[in-house]
Structures are given as C-alpha cells and as structure tokens.
Amino acid sequence: MDGRAEMEVVRTTKGNAAGEVSVHVVTTESTVQSTHLPTTAFIFPSQANATTINLPTSTLEIQRFPREPPRNTGAERPEKGVGSEPITATVIPQISGVQTCNTVRVLEWKDGVATLPGSNLRFRINEYGTLKVVSADKMPPAEAVKEGHAKKDGDSDVAPTSRDNTIVAQDVPEQSKLPTADSICHCDTCGRRHVSDGAREGRGFCSEHCHQQFKERSVIVENSASSTSATEILKPVKKRKRKDYQSPSEEDYESEQMEEKQEEMKNSVGDSAISNPEAHAWSQHSTEGPGASEEKKEGWSWASYLEEQKAVAAPLDLFQDYQVASQHKNGFKVGMKLEGIDPQHPSMYFILTVAEVCGYRMRLHFDGYSECHDFWLNADSPDIHPAGWFEETGHKLQPPKGYKEEEFSWTNYLKITKAQAAPKHLFVIRNTHEAPPGFEVGMKLEAVDRMNPSLICVATVTDVVDDRFLVHFDNWDDTYDYWCDPSSPYIHPVGWCQEHGKPLTPPQDYPDPDNFIWEKYLKETGASAVPAWAFKVRPPHGFLVNMKLEAVDRRTPSFIRVASVEDVEDHRIKIHFDGWSHVYDFWIDADHPDIHPIGWCSKTGHPLQPPLRPKEPASSAHSGCPTLGCKNIPHTKSSKYSFHHRKCPTPGCDGSGHVTGRFTAHYCLSGCPLAEKNQGKLKADLSDTEASTRKRNLIGFPQRKKSRHHGSFRGRPPKYRKIQQEDFQTISSDNMHQSLFMSALSAHPDRSLSLCWEQHCKLLPGVAGITATTVAKWTIDEVFSFVQTLTGCEDQAKLFKDEMIDGEAFLLLTQADIVKIMSVKLGPALKIYNAILMFKNADDTLK
C-alpha cells in the first residue's frame, strides 16, 4: 500500500514525570489503494528495546489525538461513528536496511506472527507484503503460515524488512473497546469495512469477489516465498503486462539471452557467406574454428584427413609470412572505401568499396562499375591503399564512372556517397618504403610473359611502389603487366636471352624483329637497362608432390579448398583439389598469396571446402551446373568465371593462348592452340613472313597480336568475357542472364568480343545462323522484320523503318546510338545491340 507518512516524536511532560515521550504516526494514504479514512496509531516498544529507537528509558504513554474530520472520498460505504468503527493498524516494514528499521525491530516474531512487547497487539503479513494488526480470534493456524513469512529461530530480534522506512498505521483503540471480529471486519482485499455474517467462508472479506482475488494473489506469494529470501517476500507483487518470471533474476537472465540471440542473428546475417571452418591447429591437433561449418557438421578435420590419406601437410617454413595466418584481425567492414590496383589492368588505380568480408579475405567492388569486375584478396594485400594515397605518391587515380578526373575529391565523394574511408591503420605497413635499388621507372629489361610463359619479351619498368615495381611489355596492352620484386624468377637483365640461348620476343610492330639488337633499341628509345647487380636470385621452393595445403579456387574465388601438390617446378607448384577431376588442376607460384598452410582457414575464420566425397552427387538435378560437386553457388556476377565449370579439355593445356591470337586465354576446345583439329588452322594462318618468328618463339602458344588501346579513355576500360562453347542443355535462364547483358556494358566494345553463341541464341532465337555478311545485304524491310522478331522489341521496329536503316547501317549502330539518338528504351536496346554483336561474332568465327 503506497502512501506518504509523517512521523512525529512529541516530548511531553505529565505531572512531575519529565521526559515522557509520545510517538505518533500520521499517514495520508492514496485514494487509489484504499478509501478508508486516515487514522493515527501508536506503537509502544518494550523497556528493553526502548534504546533501539533512541528514546529515553522512561515510561512511554499513549496520547490520544482527535481524528481528522471525515472527508468525502466518494466511497459508497456508510459512514460510522468513531467509537464503533473497527480499527486496523498496518505497518509497512522496510525491505532494505534492516539494521536501520528501529521501529519494526521492536516486534517479536514467531511462526509468522509479530507481537508488540507489553501489549496484546499482534501482526502478520498480508497479501500486499505489509504488516496488519490481527485479533486473537483471527490468528491463522501455525501450519498455514509459510516458512518464508516466519523468522528464523534464534533471530527473534530481527524482523522482516519493509519497502520504506515508514509506518502506516491506523488509530488503535484500547483492546477492551475493540468490537468483536464476528461483527465488524476489515476486508483484506479492498480495505472496506463490513459486517461479517459469520456464515461465509471468507470472513475477512466483504464479498466473494474479494475473497477469490485474495486466493489468487496468495498463490503467487506462496509460490515465490519458497524460493526467495525474507526480504524478497516482503516485496509487493506487481501486476505485469508481460510474462511472470519464476525467480527475481529470471527476467534479467532472459533479457541477456535475448540480447545474445539477437547478436548471434546479426553475426549470422553479416557472415551469411561463412560456414564454420574445420577444426585444426598448426601442430595438427584439433582446434575448433569460429562459426558453424559444413565440414564441422560432417565431422571433417585436417588431423583425421591426413591420417586417413597417409599424407603430410606442407611445412610452415615453406610459406611466406603473408601466406601464414596473420596475427592481426581483418578490420575492414562492408561499405568502407579505399584505393586499389585493378588486377586486370595492374597499371591502373581505382576507387574500391568493400563488398564482402569473409575471414581474412574480402571482396572489392569498383565504384560505378558492374559487379562482374569484383575480385577477392587478402586484407594484407599490397595492392590496396588508404584513401588519398594516390595524391601523396603522385599516382593517377581513375575516378568512379560518371566523375571527371579533375573534379574528383575524396572529401566530396565521401559526403555524396555517405560512406566511410577505410582507416589507415587497417592497411599493412611495409617494412620499407624505399624503392628496390637499381630499378627506376623507364629502365629496360627482359621479362617472361606470365600469360604465355614460353615467351620472353622486351619490357620496361613503368612504376615503383615500396619494394615492388611494375613490368610492362613494350607496345603491348597493360593487361599483360605484372608487379614483382627484384628476386622474381620472371625477370632478367638485358642480354640474358642471348647468353642462355633463349629466343627474345621484340616489341610489337618492331620494324625488323629478326634483327633486334638491344644496343640499337636502347639508343632509339633513349632508355637505359636495369643493371645486372640489381637482380636477386630466388632459391627454389621446398614443396613436394602430395603435400597438403589450402588454396583458393580460381574458378570460384570465394572458395578455399583442400588441395594437394600435384607437380612441382623450381618456382611453381601445380595445385590439385582433392576429390575433384584433374581437369581443374592449375599452376601457381609458390609464393602466391592464394595458397596457405593447413589450418589457415580455421585461424582466420574463413570457411574451408572439404574434399569432394564419392557419395556426393555430381550435381543436383536442378542445379544447372554439370560440375562434379557443384552446389550451384553462383559467382558474384563475375564475367571471367560466370561459368565456373568450364576449362579447356585438351590434356596438358592450362588454358593459355587462343588459336585466333585475339585472346590471352581460352576455355574450350575450339580455341585451344594445342588441339589436333586446330593445328591445320593454326598453320594456315601463319604467313611466310611470320613463320620464322613463330617457329622460334611459339612453343604451344601463339604470338600475341596487338590489342593495345589507342588514345585516351576515361574510366575503366571494358572487360570482355572469354567463354568456350559447350553443351548448354542444363544451363538455366538465370545463369545466362548476366552473360547476355555484359556485352553491352561498353558503347564501343572490341570486335573480337567472344560471345556465348548457343547460350544467347536461346534468348535471341532470331540471330541463329545469321552472319554480319548476310545482314549487310538486308533491305530496310528486312531489318524491320528482324527487329520485330526480337521479344519485346515489336514497338521499336517501326523506328528503324522510319529512320530508313538498312542492313549495313544496322551493323554500324552502337548502344549509345540506339538509346540516345533513336530513343529506344534500355531493355529493347540491349537485345538489339547484342544481336548486332552476335552477327559480327558469327562472321568472325566463319573467317
């Protein structure tokens, strides 16, 4: 019962007895809780306990105060006289601070009943947790009193505590003047006074409704009393709109559980691409990794797998520091922006955004460009830099698509995009910022073409960053460029080929390639050669065949798989994914950041794809991918790996080169220069003037044709997909969607763009079997009829007729012409423009 109380200690003098004290408590009860009139009561401590409330040991005596005049409270109960009203005193004990509740400590407790020493007043705790005066004939039986309401034996001087340090009491008349309990009672539930008929079962209640409410509340109090302390019992039971908790700490515990569950849900969404890595440590003892992984569910672990295969793990000392698990966590977050090197154009720097984080790896997205160009790398990669790095180092930064280079500013760009630049401390600090001695921009050297390893070409140092430099092949496209250090086995000083009897490929379009002389070329270009002493010798690696490790799947870069060393060279190893066909094997440098010792995934929190088991189906019936073990997990719209199951089927071919010479790689039999059926075509294409050069330089790979971009260009140059022709019967339309529209990313794509012919014909059936030579002879009406056959382009066909576009003009149209000049919507324009590209591709294929 909430209310305000005021205590007054009045010192009075009666006769000659000085120091006599009168104590009274005046309460003003809330009208919400009870409507009975406020009264005044006195509590008299015994002589022994008089000092407890800091009163003198003199006799305490009752001093009667007149009642306040009755106030109209709006209650319906009849007003009775003062002398005939039954009066009940209520004392609210203090819950906290038992030692300071001096007034309550004067009560003596036994079996849940308190007795005021020196009087016949008795008290008990009602359903509200407050003290209530009871008469002798209304004393509850001892067995009905709960243990939680009783005082422990031997501690009779300590009483239950109350909610506040206040006494709420009513006027207590002399015991002889109290009316009998059989006649007038005080309702234990609502507080109203009523005349008991003596026949009702609940004599302490004014109605059956109050009696029932008291029973329900008593059940709650009794249930909680058995598991709570005396101080907790005295707490009033509040009504809850939420669920009732069985223990005081249950609510807090459940709240903590809910917070933990919500946190786990956030982590699961943020790491939706992460399954639990395998359990393993560097010492080959099982160590559980974070998350909940596929291999964990299957019970896969490195320790058991090595024992099962009787294999050995590649020792740690064979790996470079950046290949071993870093001591630092990956602090990059999705949405952070930074600067980085384009892996397809290593000489160009772009603005990148973190699109996905997985363990110590992350997927980066080129701002303003399609997701098909996204790529994966480690958080400590030297290819990424903080925002503003290009200004500090004097490099040229390619702005996002739609921005002009001279107008771009990091500060404004971050404001416009409402993004955050990746903090500088997240980037790995290199050991040295000094350029490798002897290597300067513009110096010449001889370098191996990484895409065609049989070729050693004339090259130039075009950039130097920290301890690395960029190798560029003279007069070739920058797609062949690569970064390396002085110990790279792919670079040699000028004259190395002549000393070792190796053929040297001169710069493209060099006037007299058969008589190339370094001294003459250096004089013509005004350049100098890198001194021989600047080159360092890298010792061979120590990897052995069948050693186990973890490697990134090049066809699905988001995956890291269990792998074995299939073959070795001095500085390269051949990777084989355990359980997979050898068709997917590939060569990689022994110091490449995409290979790691066993347990790297577990330590960095990256999921590891376990070996493919024979029990696993080759592919699900509806997966659309015939690759063994493929779970139909698509790439991130990657143009290069949009069909990750494809690779050249020619034995011994690693996919390098192309029979036409227009591509640096191939993925099908028709483009393979090593295929028997293509040998005749390859020989026929060789002219007499090129025969001697190709016989000297070409060992299984065609000599590259010039594909360099002429003139200046803005933004990122277009990238074209290189996909072979295969049986596409099981490929779904969803998988073909990206391939169809990627060819129209650039308004002026290369004529040599390789297209997925059969795949596109399914979505554009009208182009099947038609070449550009045939289309060039079309009339205006034939162009009109063709556009009408394209799904969704019926309304646009009339525009071509109105503009009087014949076949030859039709082939000259670009995507920009169709959209901007002819005002064709983007969807139909893409279909029409892709049809034009396919006509041209069909014509080139026949040639």
UniProtKB/Swiss-Prot annotation:
Instruction: Write down the InterPro entries for this protein, in alphabetical order.
Output: Mbt (IPR004092), MBT_L3MBTL1_rpt1 (IPR047361), MBT_L3MBTL1_rpt3 (IPR047362), PcG_chromatin_remod_factors (IPR050548), SAM (IPR001660), SAM/pointed_sf (IPR013761), Znf_C2H2C (IPR002515), Znf_C2H2C_sf (IPR036060)
- Site Mediates recognition of monomethylated and dimethylated peptides — annotated at 449
By its UniProt entry, which PROSITE patterns does this protein fall under? Answer: MBT (PS51079), SAM_DOMAIN (PS50105), ZF_CCHHC (PS51802)
Which residues does the UniProt record annotate as the domain SAM?
Answer: 778-842
UniProt biased composition (Basic and acidic residues): 65-82, 144-155
Task: Spell out the residue ranges making up region: Interaction with monomethylated and dimethylated peptides.
Answer: 473-480
Entry's localization field: Nucleus
Return the GO cellular component terms, semicolon-separated: nucleus
On the tree of life, the source organism's domain of life is Eukaryota
What SUPFAM superfamilies has UniProt attached to this entry? CCHHC domain, SAM/Pointed domain, Tudor/PWWP/MBT
Binding residue positions for Zn(2+): 648, 653, 666, 672
Q: Where are the zinc fingers (CCHHC-type)?
A: 639-682
Q: Some GO term, biological process aspect, for this entry: which one?
A: negative regulation of DNA-templated transcription
In this chain the MBT repeats are located at 300-400, 408-507, 516-611
Q: Residues at site: Positioned at the entrance of MBT 2 and is required for recognition of monomethylated and dimethylated peptides?
A: 452
Q: Name one GO molecular function term.
A: zinc ion binding
Show the CDD domains listed in the entry.
MBT_L3MBTL1_rpt1, MBT_L3MBTL1_rpt2, MBT_L3MBTL1_rpt3, SAM_Scm-like-3MBT3_4
Provide the alphabetized UniProt keywords: Chromatin regulator, Metal-binding, Nucleus, Repeat, Repressor, Transcription, Transcription regulation, Zinc, Zinc-finger
Subunit record text: Homodimer.
Q: What is known of its domains?
A: The MBT repeat 2 specifically recognizes and binds monomethylated and dimethylated proteins. In contrast, it does not bind trimethylated proteins. The MBT repeat 1 does not bind methylated peptides but inserts a proline ring in a Pro-Ser-Ser/Thr sequence context.
Instruction: Write out the function statement from the record.
Output: Polycomb group (PcG) protein that specifically recognizes and binds mono- and dimethyllysine residues on target proteins, thereby acting as a 'reader' of a network of post-translational modifications. PcG proteins maintain the transcriptionally repressive state of genes: acts as a chromatin compaction factor by recognizing and binding mono- and dimethylated histone H1b/H1-4 at 'Lys-26' (H1bK26me1 and H1bK26me2) and histone H4 at 'Lys-20' (H4K20me1 and H4K20me2), leading to condense chromatin and repress transcription.
Could you identify this protein by its name? Lethal(3)malignant brain tumor-like protein 1
